[in-house]
Amino acid sequence: MIVKNEAAILSRCLDSVCDLMDEIIIVDTGSTDDTKAVAAKYTDRIYDFAWNNDFSAARNFSFSLANMDYIYAPDADEILDEENRKRFLLLKEALLPEIEIVQMKYRTVSEFNTVLNARTEYRPKLFKRVREFEGIDPIHETIRLTPVVFDSDIEILHMPQSMHHKRDFSIFVDAFNREGTFSAKLRSMYAKELLKTGDEKDFA
Protein backbone atom coordinates (compact mmCIF):
# COMPACT_ATOMS: atom_id res chain seq x y z
CA MET A 1 0.00 0.00 0.00
CA ILE A 2 1.06 3.60 -0.55
CA VAL A 3 0.93 6.02 2.39
CA LYS A 4 1.74 9.56 3.43
CA ASN A 5 1.13 11.03 6.90
CA GLU A 6 -1.26 8.24 7.88
CA ALA A 7 0.01 7.64 11.43
CA ALA A 8 -3.38 8.39 12.99
CA ILE A 9 -5.26 5.77 10.98
CA LEU A 10 -2.78 3.24 9.59
CA SER A 11 -3.13 0.79 12.47
CA ARG A 12 -6.90 0.76 12.02
CA CYS A 13 -6.45 -0.40 8.44
CA LEU A 14 -3.64 -2.87 9.02
CA ASP A 15 -5.27 -4.43 12.09
CA SER A 16 -8.23 -5.32 9.88
CA VAL A 17 -6.19 -7.04 7.16
CA CYS A 18 -2.72 -7.99 8.43
CA ASP A 19 -3.55 -11.62 9.26
CA LEU A 20 -5.18 -12.06 5.84
CA MET A 21 -2.00 -11.07 3.98
CA ASP A 22 0.98 -13.26 3.07
CA GLU A 23 3.18 -10.18 2.76
CA ILE A 24 2.72 -6.51 3.62
CA ILE A 25 4.52 -3.87 1.57
CA ILE A 26 4.41 -0.22 2.58
CA VAL A 27 5.52 2.51 0.18
CA ASP A 28 5.86 5.90 1.87
CA THR A 29 5.65 8.97 -0.36
CA GLY A 30 7.07 11.52 2.08
CA SER A 31 5.53 11.24 5.54
CA THR A 32 6.55 13.79 8.15
CA ASP A 33 4.71 12.06 11.00
CA ASP A 34 5.17 8.59 12.54
CA THR A 35 3.65 6.67 9.64
CA LYS A 36 6.73 4.55 9.04
CA ALA A 37 7.11 3.78 12.74
CA VAL A 38 3.51 2.55 12.83
CA ALA A 39 4.05 0.51 9.68
CA ALA A 40 7.15 -1.10 11.20
CA LYS A 41 4.93 -2.81 13.78
CA TYR A 42 3.43 -4.86 10.94
CA THR A 43 6.23 -5.33 8.39
CA ASP A 44 9.89 -4.65 7.72
CA ARG A 45 9.17 -4.12 4.03
CA ILE A 46 8.94 -0.34 4.05
CA TYR A 47 10.14 1.64 1.05
CA ASP A 48 10.41 5.31 0.09
CA PHE A 49 9.06 6.76 -3.14
CA ALA A 50 9.56 10.39 -4.13
CA TRP A 51 6.06 11.81 -4.60
CA ASN A 52 5.52 13.22 -8.10
CA ASN A 53 1.78 13.97 -8.02
CA ASP A 54 1.05 10.64 -9.71
CA PHE A 55 -0.76 7.94 -7.77
CA SER A 56 -0.33 5.43 -10.59
CA ALA A 57 3.45 5.82 -10.50
CA ALA A 58 3.50 5.18 -6.76
CA ARG A 59 1.09 2.26 -7.08
CA ASN A 60 3.11 0.73 -9.91
CA PHE A 61 6.25 0.96 -7.79
CA SER A 62 4.51 -0.80 -4.90
CA PHE A 63 3.25 -3.53 -7.23
CA SER A 64 6.78 -4.08 -8.56
CA LEU A 65 7.91 -5.07 -5.06
CA ALA A 66 5.32 -7.83 -4.60
CA ASN A 67 6.18 -11.53 -4.64
CA MET A 68 2.87 -13.30 -4.05
CA ASP A 69 0.44 -14.46 -6.75
CA TYR A 70 -2.11 -11.73 -5.99
CA ILE A 71 -1.81 -8.13 -4.81
CA TYR A 72 -4.38 -6.48 -2.55
CA ALA A 73 -4.22 -2.68 -2.75
CA PRO A 74 -5.89 -1.02 0.25
CA ASP A 75 -5.65 2.63 1.22
CA ALA A 76 -4.93 3.62 4.81
CA ASP A 77 -8.44 5.01 5.31
CA GLU A 78 -10.13 1.71 4.48
CA ILE A 79 -11.06 -1.18 6.76
CA LEU A 80 -12.63 -4.61 6.55
CA ASP A 81 -15.10 -5.41 9.31
CA GLU A 82 -15.28 -8.91 10.78
CA GLU A 83 -17.90 -10.21 8.35
CA ASN A 84 -15.91 -9.02 5.36
CA ARG A 85 -12.68 -10.37 6.80
CA LYS A 86 -14.36 -13.79 6.74
CA ARG A 87 -15.44 -13.23 3.15
CA PHE A 88 -11.90 -12.26 2.20
CA LEU A 89 -10.52 -15.44 3.76
CA LEU A 90 -13.09 -17.54 1.88
CA LEU A 91 -12.11 -15.75 -1.33
CA LYS A 92 -8.46 -16.65 -0.79
CA GLU A 93 -9.38 -20.30 -0.32
CA ALA A 94 -11.67 -20.51 -3.35
CA LEU A 95 -10.15 -18.06 -5.85
CA LEU A 96 -9.91 -19.63 -9.29
CA PRO A 97 -6.49 -19.21 -10.93
CA GLU A 98 -7.96 -17.74 -14.12
CA ILE A 99 -9.34 -14.72 -12.24
CA GLU A 100 -7.11 -11.69 -12.78
CA ILE A 101 -8.99 -8.89 -11.02
CA VAL A 102 -11.35 -9.05 -8.05
CA GLN A 103 -13.70 -6.14 -7.54
CA MET A 104 -15.00 -5.33 -4.08
CA LYS A 105 -17.88 -3.18 -2.93
CA TYR A 106 -16.75 0.25 -1.77
CA ARG A 107 -18.76 2.28 0.73
CA THR A 108 -17.82 5.68 2.14
CA VAL A 109 -19.03 6.55 5.65
CA SER A 110 -21.87 9.06 5.72
CA GLU A 111 -19.83 11.96 7.12
CA PHE A 112 -18.11 12.35 3.78
CA ASN A 113 -20.85 11.14 1.48
CA THR A 114 -22.34 13.35 -1.18
CA VAL A 115 -25.17 12.75 -3.60
CA LEU A 116 -22.55 11.55 -6.09
CA ASN A 117 -20.81 8.95 -3.95
CA ALA A 118 -23.53 7.84 -1.55
CA ARG A 119 -24.10 4.57 -3.38
CA THR A 120 -21.92 1.53 -2.84
CA GLU A 121 -19.88 0.85 -5.97
CA TYR A 122 -17.57 -1.86 -7.22
CA ARG A 123 -13.86 -1.07 -7.39
CA PRO A 124 -10.95 -3.28 -8.50
CA LYS A 125 -8.92 -4.08 -5.38
CA LEU A 126 -7.22 -7.47 -5.84
CA PHE A 127 -4.94 -8.11 -8.82
CA LYS A 128 -3.12 -11.10 -10.22
CA ARG A 129 0.57 -10.19 -10.15
CA VAL A 130 1.58 -11.99 -13.35
CA ARG A 131 -0.91 -12.14 -16.18
CA GLU A 132 -0.94 -15.20 -18.42
CA PHE A 133 -1.93 -14.56 -22.03
CA GLU A 134 -4.00 -17.15 -23.84
CA GLY A 135 -5.65 -17.68 -27.20
CA ILE A 136 -9.44 -17.59 -27.34
CA ASP A 137 -10.38 -18.27 -30.98
CA PRO A 138 -9.77 -21.43 -33.03
CA ILE A 139 -8.16 -19.52 -35.91
CA HIS A 140 -5.87 -16.48 -36.39
CA GLU A 141 -4.35 -16.93 -32.91
CA THR A 142 -6.43 -14.24 -31.23
CA ILE A 143 -5.15 -13.37 -27.76
CA ARG A 144 -7.59 -12.51 -25.00
CA LEU A 145 -6.89 -8.92 -23.97
CA THR A 146 -9.81 -8.32 -21.60
CA PRO A 147 -8.97 -9.42 -18.04
CA VAL A 148 -11.07 -11.99 -16.21
CA VAL A 149 -12.89 -9.99 -13.53
CA PHE A 150 -14.79 -11.37 -10.53
CA ASP A 151 -17.28 -9.21 -8.61
CA SER A 152 -17.01 -10.39 -5.01
CA ASP A 153 -19.37 -9.83 -2.08
CA ILE A 154 -16.60 -8.26 0.03
CA GLU A 155 -17.42 -4.72 1.17
CA ILE A 156 -14.69 -2.25 2.05
CA LEU A 157 -15.55 0.57 4.44
CA HIS A 158 -13.93 3.85 3.41
CA MET A 159 -13.39 6.14 6.42
CA PRO A 160 -11.50 9.24 5.22
CA GLN A 161 -10.18 11.81 7.66
CA SER A 162 -11.18 14.60 5.30
CA MET A 163 -12.06 15.37 1.72
CA HIS A 164 -9.07 15.39 -0.65
CA HIS A 165 -10.33 17.77 -3.31
CA LYS A 166 -7.42 20.26 -3.11
CA ARG A 167 -4.89 17.49 -3.60
CA ASP A 168 -6.97 15.91 -6.36
CA PHE A 169 -7.41 19.18 -8.27
CA SER A 170 -3.63 19.69 -8.12
CA ILE A 171 -3.11 16.28 -9.71
CA PHE A 172 -5.70 17.02 -12.40
CA VAL A 173 -3.90 20.28 -13.26
CA ASP A 174 -0.51 18.56 -13.44
CA ALA A 175 -1.92 15.80 -15.64
CA PHE A 176 -3.47 18.32 -18.03
CA ASN A 177 -0.32 20.44 -18.20
CA ARG A 178 1.74 17.35 -18.91
CA GLU A 179 -0.50 15.75 -21.55
CA GLY A 180 -2.42 18.76 -22.90
CA THR A 181 -5.69 16.87 -22.53
CA PHE A 182 -7.59 14.43 -20.33
CA SER A 183 -8.40 10.83 -21.13
CA ALA A 184 -12.10 10.00 -21.30
CA LYS A 185 -11.93 8.58 -17.78
CA LEU A 186 -10.17 11.63 -16.34
CA ARG A 187 -12.65 13.97 -18.03
CA SER A 188 -15.47 12.11 -16.33
CA MET A 189 -13.68 12.09 -12.96
CA TYR A 190 -12.82 15.79 -13.24
CA ALA A 191 -16.44 16.68 -13.98
CA LYS A 192 -17.59 14.71 -10.93
CA GLU A 193 -14.97 16.41 -8.76
CA LEU A 194 -16.14 19.82 -9.96
CA LEU A 195 -19.74 18.99 -9.10
CA LYS A 196 -18.78 17.75 -5.64
CA THR A 197 -16.26 20.33 -4.49
CA GLY A 198 -15.39 22.81 -7.24
CA ASP A 199 -15.70 26.58 -6.88
CA GLU A 200 -15.86 29.45 -9.39
CA LYS A 201 -12.11 29.36 -10.08
CA ASP A 202 -12.21 25.66 -10.91
CA PHE A 203 -15.00 26.17 -13.44
CA ALA A 204 -13.29 29.14 -15.11
Locate predicted features.
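Short, well-formed alpha-helical segments that are part of the catalytic scaffolds
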Residues: M1-L20
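A conserved acidic beta->alpha catalytic loop
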Residues: S16, D28-V38, W51, D75
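Conserved beta-strand positions in the Rossmann-like core of class I SAM-dependent methyltransferases
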Residues: I25-D28, Y47
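Catalytic-site signature of metal-activated, phosphate-bearing donor transferases
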Residues: A57-F63, D69, P74, L80-F203
